[in-house]
UniProtKB/Swiss-Prot annotation:
Protein family (similarity comment): Belongs to the universal ribosomal protein uS2 family.
Name of the protein this chain belongs to: Small ribosomal subunit protein uS2c
Subcellular location: Plastid, Chloroplast
Gene Ontology molecular function: structural constituent of ribosome
GO cellular component, one term: mitochondrial small ribosomal subunit
UniProt-listed GO biological process terms: translation
UniProt KW keywords: Chloroplast, Plastid, Ribonucleoprotein, Ribosomal protein
InterPro entries: Ribosomal_uS2, Ribosomal_uS2_bac/mit/plastid, Ribosomal_uS2_CS, Ribosomal_uS2_flav_dom_sf
Pfam families in the record: Ribosomal_S2
């Protein structure tokens, strides 16, 4: 894996609140190596470790993107919905930002069937085929299309399992991480002080509750993916 400089600095992370963990009563002992202090009943994350693992993650996604590999970004927190979508679109990644359906990856054949139905319905609507149907049927189809768009819209162009999955909240997206582990898909995950750093291939210790923190980490990863994609295009 090629090592590069990704302009990760401590001041920027402090300003974004990346270092604020959970209350000391909610911690996971496995996170001890990534905690530098306690302040007013809250664990403080060691930002030197954050910088190290974020840099490793950036190197990994850069190398993968430069080889034309695919990514899936998973973040279903309500406040992060728009952030996940815009970041994924910017880097041409697939994304899930509403709800993770159990078996989305492990039952890929079923997911593929749903995606095929979704694409067919979108095509029929665009071609005006709904106009020839009774109003009741049109209402049912539009409702189904709206539901599919809401939950599968971010993966509508996904034709195979992703090469790397990026998870923004380990506890909320635990099922997604387990599915990746079963399938052997490499994962990158933000881990707050109440998380288990052993569940992902690269765990980035960081505040996973504050949008400024999530945005900073995600933007670094997305920038690295974009740089890798540019190299891939130039070398084709």
């Amino acid at each position: 894996m090629t090592r590069r400089y990704w302009n990760i600095n401590l001041k920027e992370m402090i300003e974004a609140g990346v270092h604020f963990g959970h209350g000391i009563k909610k911690w996971n002992p496995k996170m001890a190596p990534y905690i530098s202090a306690k302040r007013k009943g809250t664990h403080i994350i060691n930002l030197a470790r954050t910088a190290r693992f974020l840099s490793e993650a950036c190197d990994l996604v850069f190398d993968a993107a430069s080889q034309g590999k695919s990514f899936l970004i998973v973040g279903t927190k309500k406040r992060a919905t728009d952030l996940v979508a815009s970041a994924a679109i910017r880097a041409r990644c697939h994304y899930v930002n509403k709800k993770w359906f159990s078996g989305m990856l492990t039952n890929w054949s079923i997911t593929k069937t749903r995606l095929s139905q979704f694409r067919d319905l979108r095509a029929e609507e665009k071609m005006g085929k709904f106009h020839h149907l009774p109003k009741r049927d049109v209402a049912i189809l539009k409702r189904k299309l709206s539901t599919l768009q809401r939950y599968l819209g971010g993966i509508k162009y996904m034709t195979r399992l992703p090469d790397i999955v990026i998870v923004l909240d380990q506890q909320k997206e635990y099922i997604a991480l387990r599915e990746c582990a079963i399938l052997g898909i490499p994962t990158i995950s933000l881990v707050d002080t109440n998380c288990d750093p052993d569940l992902a291939n690269i765990s980035i210790p960081a505040n996973d509750d504050t949008m400024t923190s999530i945005r900073l980490i995600l933007n670094k990863l997305v920038f690295s993916i974009c740089e890798g994609r540019s190299l891939y295009i130039r070398n084709r």
